[in-house]
Amino acid sequence: MQISKMPSGLTASFRHQLVSFAWDQWSQMGVSGHAGRRDGWSIDPEALLAFTLRVARREPRLFDEVLDWMRLNLDLISAQRLRNLALEEETEELASAALAWASTYSTKVTRQKPPSGREVEEPELLFIRSTGAMSVREPDPIFIRYGFVRPSLEPSNKSRPPVRSASINFSFRLRDLFGVSARAEVVRVLLLLHGAKPRIRDIVHAAGYSRQNVYEALNALVSAGVVFMRQTGPRDRSYALDQDRWAALLGIEDRKLPYFVEWPRLLEVLWKLLVWMESLETKESSDYMQASEARRFVADHEIDLQALGVKLPDHRSFLGADYWAPFEVLVVDDLLERLQPASDEGGRRNSE
């Protein structure tokens, strides 16, 4: 029986592609850097932020430039929504630390206040390096309150506001219109999922707010006559709006609305896949055991993978170690393919 670790090149390549994707998105949103692509989808700012704060722990420059962007554009971010999408305690602490730093250096007036830090006996190093622990002479006083040790940081002042006409920044146009609120997210979901006739559960999941917040936003929009509700069952309703009228209001010609991607689900699955890969990289196991771990990962995340439209390997057709190859192609490669450019002129519609 062959005993080996997961090929380090596979994990490193996967991590590199996630970091590159994050750089590409933020560069289009105003972070200092070269925007080498022009995506035709609408990004979810808080989902991308929760994702980036984790993957950028291995890319300090990206982490710091995103903080600078947050400082400049703090009034465009929903702290509550960010915490809602931070599904793990460590992610929530990272988000709280980032919000606290941005609030300290921002000139924007918002009603949002980051939660106070927690008592930590042994703070952990924020940045992770394969070459060993980073020496920190002067820890940042804000981050250490949230349990993270990193070098003291001042704003780079290189960031810019998002260009509202870019498809990727569509969410910010709606926030300009409705404020940073559940209403802005509800309208975004209804506009971009217009043909799908989303149910309340779909809207709640994509909006990133509580069910109560989404209900209140929908009721207000229905009362205002800009959203239409149809009773489809005793306890089931569908919602829609006049896409042409909204496109005209927003100055979007020929109904060329951005593509919808279910970013919270997709980015969370990608993050969990990276964590899983890194854990396998540290231990030796047979090809059979690695394939067994892959089978377990698919089973643990089957609901999310199927919701994203990922075609899962047939466990009956691929037995034992034979499961690994189709897993790599059908799951890993497919998820990465969804991060490839979707241009304003046309492209793959991910996760519709």
Regions inferred by a protein language model and the residue ranges of each:
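Short amphipathic alpha-helical interaction segments
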Residues: 208-224
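A short, conserved structural fragment
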Residues: 222-233
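Short, cationic-aromatic polyanion-contact patches
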Residues: 174-183, 231-255
